[in-house]
Amino acid sequence: ADQPFTRVDCGTCTRCIDACPTEAIVADREVDSRLCISYLTIELKGSIPRNLRPKMGNWIFGCDICQEVCPWNGKAPLSMEKGFAAEDSARTPDLGKLMELNQSEFRKRFKNSPVLRTKRRGLLRNVAIALGNWGNPQAIPALELGLIDQEPLIRSHSAWGLGQVATKKAYDILENALTSEEDPQVLEEIREALSAFKEKTDPIL
């Protein structure tokens, strides 16, 4: 087993602590995994807490902010190993297209990829949050598709995403979903999303 790493080279630097969107780095070299975007998007299998969703931005699988801001990492040479290189399609994936993936398409698209760890429902849950954080009406078709997915986890987070878009069309989609949805958690998310419209200072209704 590896020996515990005890050497401290951080000095007075707090860049990683300051940059973390969810304030997951709670003390010197201590991370609260329950707040870490990498944990939330990969390891957490259930619903992501609502208060953390806006802080996740467009991260859909992991997060490297703390690594990117670390001065020491800036001195590390780039790896020439091809296996570590990301495909162009993985750098800026089309979130709408990801929401269209069925189970077999998901497994084919991410074959031999660590993305399989989060499973389809986990990835599309994350995509729904990213689309909601985008807040653009162009996200509505993908979120509407997510709202009728067979997985309650995807439906519930798609409802939240529609609440963030806050247009009349999004509102109508959520209201219509109330008449057909039966899952208690999804219904709760739909009602919360509808109430979010009323809290906005200038909802587009």
Name the predicted role of every residue range:
Residues 1-5, 33-52, 103-107:
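Short, charged low-complexity linear segments at domain edges
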Residues 105-109, 136-148, 167-179, 201-205:
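Amphipathic alpha-helical scaffolding segments comprising HEAT/armadillo-like alpha-solenoid repeats
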Residues 1-18:
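Glycine-rich adenosyl-nucleotide cofactor-binding module
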Residues 84-96, 116, 129, 138:
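Conserved nucleotide- and phosphate/pyrophosphate-binding catalytic cores
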Residues 120, 150-152, 182-183:
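Short inter-helical turns and helix N-cap capping residues of alpha-solenoid HEAT/ARM repeat scaffolds
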Residues 15-39, 59-83, 142:
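Iron-sulfur cluster-binding cysteine motifs and their immediate structural context
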Residues 52-84, 101, 105-116, 122-129:
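C-terminal amphipathic alpha-helical segment
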Residues 124-135, 145, 155-167, 187-200:
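Structural detector for internal amphipathic alpha-helices that build alpha-solenoid repeat scaffolds
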